[in-house]
């Protein structure tokens, strides 16, 4: 009699081959496969599919169907299902920290780019100013030194006499009365005397 009861209590595997133990009341399938079977039937008939089994219902159904030898397998399956359903808080925190760090990096890069742009503009303006100065210097041709007498066109070389009127003369035509110099010596002398001898005017006496 005891052998018959032990033989009747031997559990059978799920008919779908999922690895869990089945139940005669659910057509030899486990509770999960049986619910999926019902959902497929309802979807084929056009009915609204029932909600997916929650983790709590799965945990409630597994200990009833499993024997002592299959407890570790069922527990591992339950843990894997729960870990897949529940979101990881560590991943959320890591994503939040990465977004904050990226925003900080963007702000620092913008702050660094502003002074770099100002320095670049200053260097460009300085370069343009230097180029314009060099161009103006190159356009100014050096004046050729006159080496001939303005009156007789005699070549005087380094022995010529340069007058205040701006021309070069030889030893004969170097005097102002000879070459009819256009420079006004009287006005120059009067201006020099005026600068060297300023007019001194005393203060007026105030009557008491």
Curated annotation (Swiss-Prot):
* InterPro entries, per the entry: AN1-like_Znf, AN1_A20_ZnFinger, Znf_A20, Znf_AN1
* Residues modified as Phosphoserine: 49
Q: Which domain of life is it from?
A: Eukaryota
Per UniProt, Zn(2+) 1 binds at: 14, 18, 30, 33
Q: Does the keyword Acetylation apply?
A: yes
Q: Where are the zinc fingers (AN1-type)?
A: 143-189
Which SUPFAM superfamilies does the annotation name?
Answer: AN1-like Zinc finger, Glucocorticoid receptor-like (DNA-binding domain)
Low complexity: which segments have biased composition? 83-94
Q: Name one Pfam family in it.
A: zf-A20
Q: Using the record's annotations, give every residue carrying the modification N6-acetyllysine.
A: 204
Which terms are listed as keywords in the entry? Acetylation, Metal-binding, Phosphoprotein, Zinc, Zinc-finger
The residues the record assigns to binding Zn(2+) 3 are: 163, 165, 179, 181
What ranges of residues constitute the A20-type zinc fingers? 8-42
GO terms for MF: DNA binding; polyubiquitin modification-dependent protein binding; zinc ion binding
Annotated binding of Zn(2+) 2, by residue? 149, 152, 170, 173
List, alphabetically, the Gene3D superfamilies matched: 1.20.5.4770, AN1-like Zinc finger (4.10.1110.10)
Which region ranges are annotated with the description Disordered?
A: 41-110
Q: Which PROSITE patterns match?
A: ZF_A20 (PS51036), ZF_AN1 (PS51039)
Compositional bias, Polar residues, is annotated for 54-68, 95-110
- SMART domains listed in its UniProt record: ZnF_A20, ZnF_AN1
Its BP terms in the Gene Ontology are: protein targeting to peroxisome
- UniProt subunit comment: Interacts with PKN1.
Annotated protein name in UniProt: AN1-type zinc finger protein 6
Species for this entry? Bos taurus
